[in-house]
From Swiss-Prot:
Any single Pfam family the record assigns to this protein: Ribosomal_S7
GO cellular component, one term: small ribosomal subunit
Disulfide bridge map: none
Function statement: One of the primary rRNA binding proteins, it binds directly to 16S rRNA where it nucleates assembly of the head domain of the 30S subunit. Is located at the subunit interface close to the decoding center, probably blocks exit of the E-site tRNA.
Keywords: Ribonucleoprotein, Ribosomal protein, RNA-binding, rRNA-binding, tRNA-binding
Protein name in UniProt: Small ribosomal subunit protein uS7
Keyword Chloroplast: no
GO biological process, one term: translation
Length: 156
């Protein structure tokens, strides 16, 4: 671990097309091999499809989807006297949002067929409606934390 000062956290600028910080974060998670314009086009196309299907504001639906997929608690492994315990811990807001975006992208990629934009649009709409794999993953994470509540005193 570095002995120098902690790195200064750079502010995330809002996406130029949607004027939204979450959209910028999503583009970064969608991007593969530095192809940012491709990732931006995928997000833009997905938002277009969401707008067509719902008739509402796609950015609002996107924010709702991220909020619904964001975990509040997670379990982390902690070794105590030769045994490894799954210790439930609260998730900071930035980490929770990052996890939600990562899950949304990963589960979109895992969906069947069609273009990435269609898969992403489907996953976002499902998440906004409290359904979909990303929301199921959040519920699973919360259940794990609830089941291991007895080890909460091992928090670090």
């Amino acid at each position: 671990m570095s002995r120098r000062n902690a790195a200064v956290k750079r502010p995330i600028l809002p996406d130029p097309q949607f004027n939204n910080r979450l959209a910028t974060m999503m583009v970064a998670r969608l991007m593969k091999h530095g192809k940012k314009s491709t990732a931006q086009r995928i997000l833009s196309d997905a938002f277009g499809m969401i707008g067509e299907r719902t008739g509402g504001d796609p950015v609002e639906l996107f924010e709702t989807a991220v909020k619904n997929a964001t975990p509040l608690v997670e379990v982390r492994a902690r070794r105590v006297g030769g045994a490894t315990y799954q210790v439930p811990m609260e998730v900071r807001q930035e980490r929770g949002t990052a996890m939600a975006l990562r899950w949304l992208v990963n589960f979109s990629r895992a969906r069947n067929g069609r273009s990435m934009a269609q898969k992403l649009a489907g996953e976002l709409m499902d998440a906004a409606n409290e359904a979909g794999s990303a929301v199921r993953k959040r519920e699973e994470t919360h259940k794990m934390a609830e089941a291991n509540k007895a080890f909460a005193h091992y928090r670090y």
